[in-house]
Amino acid sequence: MQRRIMGIETEFGVTCTFHGHRRLSPDEVARYLFRRVVSWGRSSNVFLRNGARLYLDVGSHPEYATAECDNLIQLVNHDRAGERVLEELLIDAEQRLAEEGIGGDIYLFKNNTDSAGNSYGCHENFLVARAGEFSRISDVLLPFLVTRQLICGAGKVLQTPKAATFCLSQRAEHIWEGVSSATTRSRPIINTRDEPHADAEKYRRLHVIVGDSNMSESTTMLKVGTAALVLEMIEAGVSFRDFALDNPIRAIREVSHDVTGRRPVRLAGGRQASALDIQREYHARAVEHLQNREPDPQVTQVVELWGRMLDAVETQDFAKVDTEIDWVIKRKLFQRYQDRHGFELADPKIAQLDLAYHDIKRGRGVFDVLQRKGLVKRITEDETIEAAVDTPPQTTRAKLRGEFITAAQEAGRDFTVDWVHLKLNDQAQRTVLCKDPFRSVDERVERLIASM
């Protein structure tokens, strides 16, 4: 499947600092954030005009699920648009706090852990064909996903009883299973719950919940692009060396703690391989695969950055990727800060900087400051991100959903939508079932809109 439906779900961390007045619980802060949403959507679980879903998840975490996208740049734009949507809620909530005399600064973090040790996720979704062995997909994908943090982790300072250490991944310490149908209880690498949000006879949805939330556009593109390409190769019958891991959960932590990528992890049958070895194998197969597939500049860009990052890890010279990969950008930032101020990695100021990197408020968040200074590479533009806040992808089912929502809201009509249903809540209860996520034109939807 060379044209694939993809999406990213991001849970955001929330905190609020108060100006000497009464403190609010995380639940209360979340309610302030979503008050405007509830006022027009009558719920804290809504679909937006750009086709995305916005809702309050377990533990008072705002979650933004992008609309269905069918290319990587489009997906990065819509992922970044989610930050803008949440930033608008943040600004609105701060104004409400001020009006009510509470006063405080709300922070939304696009990260995966808080100071209390809780974890919240960034989930990738890929449409796959129902035909074929799902077990083969998970078998081949698992070693890739365990070691993928080497090329696209968000980076984190982990405080241990012995000392502070820099890790590749924020999520690695919180994953407890390889493949499972649960998401919160056991936190698997791949979630197998069968909810295709499409024609179940043709498709299923691969739900990857091991990834970090990325600030860098290049890292997001690399994270999703490499996974999509490995999926494509599995479907095309490409053979890979057997890297079945003896203990994926131990391996994911070992990989996260080793920025050299050279620490051996134990494979099934007693063999060993490093994260760098495993990623090199997948990358080599990808380079070969590109010779036999239709040219795609975005995929070529992904494979080029993948190779460049592996070279950087191998030589430990990160100069060629230090504006593109989150954990590399972050580590360089920490090292400069330590050199300037003489701090140890365990210093609370470093932990503060770690958190501030993920602050999504423009002008305040550290990543945004780096971006404004030209110290991180862009692959999108502000204009296309702003457009994605209100406009759905024009090449997928999201276009139908977005147009329906816009028309219903402008006509003042009561409606209900989810990923596959568009329903007018009138006497006739007219509903259109959109089971094909690739389809962006549908006469049934056009008739429903025309009838408003």
From Swiss-Prot:
It catalyses: ATP + [prokaryotic ubiquitin-like protein]-L-glutamate + [protein]-L-lysine = ADP + phosphate + N(6)-([prokaryotic ubiquitin-like protein]-gamma-L-glutamyl)-[protein]-L-lysine. Pathway: Protein degradation; proteasomal Pup-dependent pathway; Protein modification; protein pupylation. GO terms for biological process: modification-dependent protein catabolic process; proteasomal protein catabolic process; protein pupylation. The keyword ATP-binding applies. ATP binds at R53, T66, W419. Pfam families: Pup_ligase. The active site is at D57. GO terms for molecular function: ATP binding; ligase activity, forming carbon-nitrogen bonds; magnesium ion binding; ubiquitin-like protein transferase activity. HAMAP family: Pup_ligase (MF_02111). Catalyzes the covalent attachment of the prokaryotic ubiquitin-like protein modifier Pup to the proteasomal substrate proteins, thereby targeting them for proteasomal degradation. This tagging system is termed pupylation. The ligation reaction involves the side-chain carboxylate of the C-terminal glutamate of Pup and the side-chain amino group of a substrate lysine. This is Pup--protein ligase 1.
